[in-house]
Amino acid sequence: MTERFTGRLADVIRRPLITEKATRALELNQYTFEVDHRAAKPDIKAAVEQLFDVKVTGISTMNPPRRSRRVGRFAGKRAQVKKAVVRLAEGSSIQLFPES
């Protein structure tokens, strides 16, 4: 784990990504999260294991380039996002959708 997120592991994971592809990956015990763009794989692993009490077997990350956005005559950039696909050990699962 890097020094940046020591003691602040809850700040690493922003939100789960619920897309068609991510939903299909749930069947393979893979969960997709939007994470802080400065987080390294050890940070993400430690955060998921601590927050959800599961065992992580692997992580794949994607850091796509920022996209430009125009509003009238003003140009800007969208916030930088980093996606992480987390593979869990057999028998581990994360409850993303609460049962009611």
UniProtKB/Swiss-Prot annotation:
Keywords carried by this UniProt record: Ribonucleoprotein, Ribosomal protein, RNA-binding, rRNA-binding
One Pfam family in the UniProt entry: Ribosomal_L23
Domain of life: Bacteria
InterPro entries per record: Nucleotide-bd_a/b_plait_sf, Ribosomal_uL23-like, Ribosomal_uL23/eL15/eS24_sf, Ribosomal_uL23_CS
Matches recorded under SUPFAM superfamilies: Ribosomal proteins S24e, L23 and L15e
Physiological role: One of the early assembly proteins it binds 23S rRNA. One of the proteins that surrounds the polypeptide exit tunnel on the outside of the ribosome. Forms the main docking site for trigger factor binding to the ribosome.
Record's protein name: Large ribosomal subunit protein uL23
Gene it is expressed from: rplW
